[in-house]
Design a protein with these regions (language model features):
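Extracellular carbohydrate recognition
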Residues: 147
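Binuclear metal-ion centers of metallo-dependent hydrolases, dominated by the metallo-beta-lactamase
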Residues: 155
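Conserved sequence/active-site signature of Rossmann-fold short-chain dehydrogenase/reductase
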Residues: 160
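Catalytic PLP-binding core of fold-type I/II PLP enzymes
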Residues: 164
Length: 187
């Protein structure tokens, strides 16, 4: 019964298309309370965590996507996933720094979260993230702010992606580097 109640509560935090599924391990946090800020497309399965910050952010997920268990997508500006995107377990995607860089500002930010909740006016160096159709992000990879993954891009497991990736390209490593381009028969 608890899982059912939790899924009902999460549905009130987002727009969930017909036949999209929030699994028992899914978590949805819409800090601003703006339901359309998290939009999940048809036939998408979410097992991970979706979070928009109190001062803004939006997450748009296309159709037939999969977000694995332990994956985290945190937005303070904009994270968009195309159609048929596969996000493996324990992937992290962020369009922001999560905390200010200056130590004093970081301390003030943390104190405010503890005392009054997440602030609604904060500069976290936000830069949008775009993930193209048919992209695949391997287990435990991290996609940082400002990155675009082209159509069909593949990110190897455990990669740290700090720069945009061209369509139909495989990258891997820390930091991620081009491994090879996919051939026409692999597209």
């Amino acid at each position: 019964m608890t899982g059912l109640l939790n899924r009902f509560r999460m549905r009130r935090q987002c727009l969930l298309a017909q036949d999209a599924v929030l699994h028992d391990t899914a978590r949805v946090f819409n800090m601003a309370g703006n339901r359309p800020a998290i939009d999940i497309g048809r036939f998408t399965h979410v097992r991970g965590e979706l979070l928009t910050f109190a001062h803004g952010g939006e997450i748009r997920i296309g159709e037939y996507c999969y977000i694995g268990e332990g994956a985290r997508i945190w937005s303070a500006r904009s994270i968009r996933l195309g159609n048929r995107v596969l996000i493996a377990h324990n992937v992290t995607i962020m369009d922001n720094l999560t905390h200010p860089i200056a130590a004093a500002a970081r301390h003030d930010h943390f104190r405010q979260i503890i005392q009054t909740g997440h602030p609604r006016d904060l500069d976290l160096g936000e830069r949008a993230v775009e993930i193209g159709d048919d992209a695949w992000i391997g287990c435990a990879s991290v996609i940082l702010r400002g990155v675009s993954l082209g159509k069909g891009a593949i990110i190897g497991a455990g990669s740290l992606v700090t720069e945009s990736v061209a369509p139909w390209t495989i990258v891997g490593g820390n930091p991620a580097r081009v491994i090879r381009e996919l051939g026409p028969d692999e597209r």
